[in-house]
């Protein structure tokens, strides 16, 4: 016969076991709920990724990125720091603008005058390179680039060789020498960079001149207007079109000619998605790092 103390002990053990079992059941329920919550969260992740990655899987393997005037979010446009930033950030191409000084030197600068970049009204074609080289073109960036100068094309070619491809836009005006295009093509050839460069311009005659000098040198016709007969532009290997001209029909027609479509200027996810869906081959952007990361 069990003693009263033993009965009490047995009851306590039973109660303890019951409590442990109850706790374990509660824990399992909480774990199940937590696991279910985790599954729900994980199941939502692809939706978030797809919502952000509007360009589609693997789009960077199909589309090249061109840094417009270098990476001009990191340094002043069309300067060596901007070109170096584009290389360091992994852009495929740099787009830059070439023009000519009073003494015939090929320099990298977009505008006809210095007003926007320096506050000075002087025209590029009225100044020698020696005069231009004394001017800081990054004064509006504060002290960060206090010694930044207008680079020569030769300087840029030397730095970029075997590092990155160049989309060299010809800025045409009435003050350039007659051998302007010949100097440009000759310098590219002398540096052994013909396969690394593409000459582009709004001026189709400049592209014709390029092809006469070097038929193998790649060219691109820039346009902000619809091109009704792209097949007529035989001296253009590619077409550089403003973003509003990009659509599947236009891109398909140009592709049927064996030519590529380069879109400008593409600075947001919507524009990237538009170009990708249309089949554009190359995107010129002011924000290369952001476009590549998104």
Kindly give the residue locations of the regions a language model identified.
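N-terminal secretory signal peptides that target proteins for export/translocation
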Residues: 1-26
